[in-house]
From Swiss-Prot:
The gene is L1. One of its GO terms (molecular function) is structural molecule activity. Residues 128-148 are annotated as: Disordered. This is Major capsid protein L1. One of its GO terms (cellular component) is host cell nucleus. Self-assembles into homopentamers. The capsid has an icosahedral symmetry and consists of 72 capsomers, with each capsomer being a pentamer of L1. Interacts with the minor capsid protein L2; this interaction is necessary for viral genome encapsidation. Interacts with protein E2; this interaction enhances E2-dependent replication and transcription activation. It comes from the Viruses. Its main location: virion. Keywords: Capsid protein, Disulfide bond, Host nucleus, Host-virus interaction, Late protein, T=7 icosahedral capsid protein, Viral attachment to host cell, Viral penetration into host cytoplasm, Virion, Virus endocytosis by host, Virus entry into host cell. One of its GO terms (biological process) is endocytosis involved in viral entry into host cell. It comes from Human papillomavirus 14.
Amino acid sequence: MAVWQAASGKVYLPPSTPVARVQSTDEYVQRTNIYYHAYSDRLLTVGHPYFNIYDVQSAKIKVPKVSGNQHRVFRLKLPDPNRFALADMSVYNPDKERLVWACRGIEIGRGQPLGVGSVGHPLFNKVGDTENPNSYRQQANSTDDRQNVSFDPKQLQMFIIGCAPCMGEHWDRALPCVEDKPPPGSCPPIELKNTVIEDGDMADIGYGNLNFKALQENRSDVSLDIVNEICKYPDFLKMQNDVYGDSCFFYARREQCYARHFFVRGGKTGDDIPAAQVDEGSLKNVYYIPPMTNQPQNNIGNAMYFPTVSGSLVSSDAQLFNRPFWLQRAQGHNNGICWFNQLFVTVVDNTRNTNFSISVSSENTEVSKIDNYTSQKFQEYLRHVEEYEMSLILQLCKIPLTAEVLAQINAMNSNILEEWQLGFVPAPDNPIHDTYRYIESAATRCPDKNPPKEREDPYKNFNFWNVDLTERLSLDLDQYSLGRKFLFQAGLQQSTVNGTKTVSTRGSIKGIKRKRKN
């Protein structure tokens, strides 16, 4: 980046030239007036809201974890526009240009009614209520003060659109210095880590973006759904300052919470309140004055305070979903171009967080034949369902294969040029090759040990919800809800030119001017 720096004196010198400059996609991408509508099927998932259910015999997952507090990361696969048999071949020249998709609009559909879900822990580390105490709590002789506590999580609606996965951040355990190794039982150092947000990663529900699995060994400080998980939060600062802006074209976010209850943790305090034990009493009476020995306050309580959050009211007046969003200008240099013909949609929505309670008779008896109610004769189950639908407006764009543009794309990601098959084409060799029939038998030579490698998926180690839209595109925008909204919101109309449907501005019709009466 070109920044001014201070010299040895008090004069700031300009940056040295030349300085590499990243171009916006608008500088070399030529947009056409051809638009497509893409849509997915109804996307459904069902599971347990708190944890995976395993088969006892084989440790195989019988019921997956499906929570309203999870990230849903959809990887939308688009068809290659360079393989389209366009009716109007004058749209682009395949020898001098390549076609790409640009995202112009999106609508994330959400089914199911609004509802508030609850999370909790049957052995929650909560010693007492510190909001309205009327007597000082005596230190109990019990070594276990955990209680069965539940609460509703922080309310969160958010989606992030980009052609690369969304980057998340969380706090994790860090490696201590070798020369300053902490003693056992001391608080470990922590550091901020950046990782890709995958489908199923937990979002922040009010206890922060932390690796609870590594930093809460008592397994009772948070609810069951995150006690063995990593809660991630999108790193908006990193994505906004990305030089290319592929991870986030734009986003929408709505969060709200308030503190409902105020509790205190149990256990031995690791960080004592500074008092007379520090520096020969230099901090005596700084934070508190010691009570008399015959008072209950003489055995001072724990200072590990924390609230249980609440997402408060869930209303249809503040919904981010089931409405269209139009992309005119992205926040980064990539103005909606879908490199590699894919789009990543990261979604969190816990305003439809209802958990179904399903009860089944353990004796397999019909309901009409049950004489009286016995709670032990019924088994209770929890299930959570999610329902999504994706709709897109895609604009067909072309990129000229000039030296300046290819140099820019090669510096950004050379795999794009490989996908376009712009490599060196060798001269044809001898058309006759040897082909063995029984190549695997012991009578013939060994087969080639180094077959040509196909291009590996850079995201093969990540978990996404893959949605194939390669055969879900249509030029008939007026036949779909999002397509009609796109045409009407800008006063556009569709017409057919050389067999290809294009979009143009609707001409205005002037009204008849009335003659003024005398």
